[in-house]
Amino acid sequence: MVSRDKELGRFLIIDLRRLPTKNLNEDIDWIARCFGFLETRDGAQTAARIFKTLLNSTKEGDGLTSDELAEKVGVTRGAIIHHLNKMMNSGLIIIQSGQYKLRGRSPRRTVVEVRLDLIRVLEKIEDIASCIDDELNLPYRETQ
């Protein structure tokens, strides 16, 4: 019998060519695209503006409410919530006491934490795959 587990997380990592030159705004957009929440159809670049606003609030040591983000970014609270949910699903931001903030103290720390999440998920998958190998008596061999 197959159990229907609640989804604990979902990761979307897009492998994009690294930008040739250093540019703060382009680098922030690149990270947003790599995590799949900067959509090409988002002509107003709302997601990027939200992410940049959250980065600035992290620099100041604060989080922001959805209402504060809506005011700073200049879009509806509904649009803010839509993009925040995508960013939370990507693992980059969290909500604490009603305030949204980067998951780590910096973009790099946030990416490190997401990487550790991915490793934990892959280890669980590998463990089950190993059980299947054992059950089916399938050999595991390193690539030569």
Language-model segments: which ranges?
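Short alpha-helical segments that sit at the start of domains
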Residues: 16-52
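A short, conserved structural fragment
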Residues: 88-99
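Short helix-capping/hinge SLiMs at alpha-helix to coil transitions
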Residues: 55-61
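Amphipathic alpha-helical dimerization/coiled-coil segments
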Residues: 111-144
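A short alpha-helical element within helix-turn-helix/winged-helix DNA-binding domains
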Residues: 63-73
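Short, cationic-aromatic polyanion-contact patches
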Residues: 42-47, 65, 98-120
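Basic amphipathic alpha-helical segments that dock to polyanions
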Residues: 69, 80-90
